[in-house]
Amino acid sequence: MRRLIILAEVALGLLFASCTKEEQRTLSVIPAPLKVELQQEVFSLNSETGLYIDASEGDKKILEDYLVASSMNLKPVIAEEGHNVVLKQVAELPEVNSSEGYVLTVTPDQVLIRATSGAGLFYGVHSLLRVV
């Protein structure tokens, strides 16, 4: 009888040990984003994907060199429209409370990174490279 109880305890222990939580999708971005909204839509990088940067000339050159040298293989373009990765330095972002913060938005047609500084754009690009 004692063996039967021990066997039952072991069986229950194995049963509970084999149960796992549902896998959660996480992003390996450091520092962790304040907010993440995962969508079903995806942006597909291809040979036609361009890079448009709307920032100061100094920041633009640094960001362009960094992204062109990356594994994303982007080609600079002169228009924001199209299947592009777009970096925009804007005057203000109400949802961001840091000069180095950024907003990264992905749609099937475009990847848009907005920030109020070159540093914010750089960190946005770094996050993009981490999730690609």
Question: What spans do the regions from the language model cover?
Answer:
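Acidic, contiguous N-terminal accessory segments
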Residues: 19-132
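Bacterial Sec-dependent N-terminal signal peptides
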Residues: 1-28
